[in-house]
Amino acid sequence: MVWHGFLAKAVPTVVTGAVGVAAYEALRKMVVKAPLRAATVSVAAWGIRLAREAERKAGESAEQARLMFADVLAEASERAGEEVPPLAVAGSDDGHDH
């Protein structure tokens, strides 16, 4: 009876281990066959894509934070009784009088 309980618990563990070893060996053989340069280029391309996406999201977040801060500052100035000048975008002076 004790052996039956032991085997009932051990068999799934052994099967899981065997499947893991088989998957590891298959992956190892596939990596050995694949050219290292192609794999390196693929990983670098993924890294570039991720960096661009992170940069885009950071830019959007920075713009959102700037606008939120400007709104808070304008409301605070308004409550304090000061007139709030419109925000100017840096580098927007094109030399024309409108």
Swiss-Prot record:
Q: What induces it?
A: Highly up-regulated during the early stages of invasion of the human blood-brain barrier.
Q: Which InterPro entries match?
A: DUF1490 (IPR009963)
Q: Where is this region: Disordered?
A: 77-98
Could you name the domain of life of the organism this protein comes from? Answer: Bacteria
What Pfam families does the database record attribute to this sequence? Answer: DUF1490
A Gene Ontology cellular component where this protein is annotated is: plasma membrane
Q: Which family does it belong to?
A: To M.tuberculosis Rv1991c and Rv3269.
The name this protein carries in UniProt is: Uncharacterized protein Rv0968
Lineage at the top is:
Bacteria, Bacillati, Actinomycetota, Actinomycetes, Mycobacteriales
